[in-house]
């Protein structure tokens, strides 16, 4: 094999030298950043992380450097917050200073600061407020949000009955239900689960969800300026993001032809009405680009996350038949087997509510929230974090806190019950993060999880294909997400 030519070798040395200089400069001029392991040129602290179990690596580093420490991803510093006290202090007590959105280049480069998730400043405040109010106001003379979710729960149960108590993988069916709810919210339409248009949309969302954890995406997020010129699967990811956006824009065109501002049918109608109201404001953030990206954000955040939580939840109930039996008993006693569950039943179902909370705590679907960033030079404890620095609130460190949740590695609904069997709230329940940047769809997700979960358990007994004690429930840690291991089960009608 030939040695590298002198020009190539010189270029390589130059790149490494510049990278080392960049890291050194940031460390010298970075205010008083929290302590952390010494980064290497180009790769930063990647070698200190087990990419197959990043949460374990972050907890290990916290033991060495404390609850606030600095890691370098590539050449860029990131402040990690470990534990409830520091996360609360940053996101609640100093929330306005930590309100920025940290980098996630693979999505950021496609959405370019539009939509809800990756926008900043006044645009973010405006679009978030509009989206929250629109979701809240569903039902003003129309079908309420709860009615839309209940309708989908009935359709989901009909599909599950078609399995005829035979072994099946629930992944696809459970993903269809929350995706259809988003379709109903955005453009007042739901699809049969075998509809070709719907299947194409599901394919785009599903592939991107799983590819977020791939080595290609991780490399892009570390070195976006280089990776954008290199062929690879990261380009397929961006194309699929564009596919979801184009799907929404087609629906927008249909709505523009039949829009009645006095009688909005859905989210798209409400947004189009705002565009019309502000058509003379050339700087208005109510435009088609923000509409398309807001819709994409709702699909991305509201489909796979909810379905994965449901899928993991069913697996845990198959693993723990004694818990499933208590849920069945409570549902039969409070609701019966024929009346559709509704949100007003939640207060009367403390054990079921505790099980749902424990599922979300135990699986820690998102070990870390999406990255934040400080919007100004920020004094935090004994440190000064420079403006624009990324911040990772490490949610797993809260959800698995040993003082708040004794034996946190054990699945135990008792974590959310008091001595009288009543539901027990805790500030440490943070699967949707904390503060003003918490998940905009939290209310919808909580509603979906409750109504889908109770409707399924009302109608079916969940049966394992092996002895429950032999079931593997260890999360598959893939980087950004904790996913359930693949499994099949039987649903036996009750």
UniProtKB/Swiss-Prot annotation:
Modified residues (Phosphoserine): 131
Cited Gene3D superfamilies: Cytochrome P450
Signal peptide feature range: 1-25
Residues annotated to bind heme: 439
SS bond partners: none
EC numbers on record: 1.14.14.-
Pathway: Lipid metabolism; arachidonate metabolism
Key word Aminoacyl-tRNA synthetase present: no
Pfam families tied to this protein: p450 (PF00067)
N6-acetyllysine found at: 253, 379
Induction: Up-regulated by high sodium or high potassium diets. High sodium intake increases expression in thick ascending limb and distal convoluted tubule. An increase in dietary potassium intake induces expression in distal convoluted tubule and cortical collecting duct.
Compartments (UniProt record): Endoplasmic reticulum membrane; Microsome membrane
GO molecular function, one term: heme binding
One Gene Ontology term, aspect cellular component: endoplasmic reticulum membrane
Example GO BP: arachidonate metabolic process
Family listed: Belongs to the cytochrome P450 family.
Summary of the function given for this chain in its UniProt record: A cytochrome P450 monooxygenase involved in polyunsaturated fatty acids (PUFAs) metabolism and signaling. Catalyzes preferentially the epoxidation of double bonds of PUFAs. Converts arachidonic acid (ARA, C20:4(n-6)) primarily to stereospecific products 8R,9S-epoxyeicosatrienoate (EET) and 11R,12S-EET. Plays a major role in the formation of EETs and hydroxy-EETs (HEETs) in kidney. Via EETs may inhibit the epithelial sodium channels (ENaCs) in nephron segments, preventing excessive sodium absorption during high dietary salt intake.
Protein name: Cytochrome P450 2C44
Species of the source: Mus musculus
